[in-house]
From Swiss-Prot:
Gene that encodes the chain: spxH
Lineage: Bacteria, Bacillati, Bacillota, Bacilli, Bacillales
Record-linked SUPFAM superfamilies: Thioredoxin-like (SSF52833)
Extra remark: Goehring et al. suggest that the cysteine residues are important for the role of YjbH/SpxH in disulfide stress management. However, mutation of all seven cysteine residues in B.subtilis ortholog by Engman et al. shows that these cysteines are dispensable for the function of the protein and that the activity of the adapter is not activated or deactivated via redox-active cysteines.
InterPro entries cross-referenced by the UniProt entry: Adapter_SpxH, Thioredoxin-like_sf
The name this protein goes by in its record: ClpXP adapter protein SpxH
Sequence similarity: Belongs to the SpxH family.
Length: 268
């Protein structure tokens, strides 16, 4: 489960000409086919909920040869190549692109890495992305150039595996901290608190019903991570929502999912 924590040289961010921000920047390098990356997405969702005013997360599909080769092998055209689809989604905003990849991971992991064009189209629309614009963007050669930029960033930060997170404080002259692999939630909160260097207040998560409506499709593991409730209590609350016809349970070989039956909340 655990990976490696190590300090990076401060040149990593400056060499790629990234402007400083007033928050902690977290670069998340992920593999859409990795179960550990799927688990980390729940942790990142919780971090964003609790520390939203202190952090900014940038998701980057790890452009390694292994990942890109698998993306190509799973596709029959640009329309079902998850790497190109993610870059095309980014052109309509990173928040929507992150929502898209979250929905795709919810589909990919339980279905044993199977990707179809219809699956991508459904996730694109559920993420609030204009489908026709997305299809046009998929035909543009600049997507490949964008992947090359991501590759440059990954090389500068010496990314060797996914998931990997790189934390930077607001001071561009400070060193970054790279966390390779998957760790318990408290490790990430400790890093954030240390980088802030002062007491910070956490936000509370939204109501369970609201969160599922926002995400549309969630796993038990994700909800247990977000809410930290006893599993028995969480199941009780989920059953209440199911009786109210607000959600439904979906069974997959790798676990149970809960799907919202409520109108989706549009991405901003």
């Amino acid at each position: 489960m655990a990976g490696e924590l190590r300090i990076m040289e401060n040149k990593s961010r400056e060499d790629i000409n990234l402007s400083p921000v007033s928050k902690i920047e977290i670069y998340s390098f992920f593999d859409p086919f990795s179960s550990d990356c799927f688990k980390l997405s729940a942790i990142l969702s919780k971090l964003r909920i609790e520390y939203n005013q202190y952090i900014r997360i940038r998701h980057i599909l790890n452009p390694s040869l292994k990942v890109l080769t698998k993306c190509q092998a799973q596709s029959t055209s640009n329309f079902d190549n998850i790497a190109l689809a993610y870059k095309a989604a980014e052109l309509q905003g990173r928040v929507r692109a992150e929502r898209f990849i979250h929905l795709m991971q919810n589909e990919i992991i339980p279905k044993r890495d199977i990707i179809t064009e219809s699956m991508i189209c459904d996730c694109i629309q559920n993420a609030g992305i204009d489908l026709e614009v997305f299809k046009d963007d998929l035909q543009k050669s600049k997507l490949t150039e964008s992947l090359k930029i991501d590759l440059h960033i990954a090389r500068e930060m010496e990314i060797e595996q996914a998931p990997s997170l790189v934390f930077f404080s607001e001071d561009v002259h400070e060193e970054g901290l790279k966390v390779e692999g998957l760790y318990p939630y408290h490790i990430y909160t400790y890093i954030i608190n240390e980088l802030m260097g002062k007491p910070i207040e956490k936000n509370l998560p939204p109501k369970l019903e609201t969160y599922i409506q926002q995400q549309q499709l969630v796993t038990m593991e994700e909800l247990l991570t977000i809410y930290e409730w006893p599993e028995k209590l969480l199941n009780k609350e989920l059953k209440k929502l199911a009786i109210q016809q607000k959600i439904e349970k979906l069974k997959y070989p790798d676990g149970d999912f809960w799907k919202s039956k409520m109108p989706k909340i549009k991405s901003k």
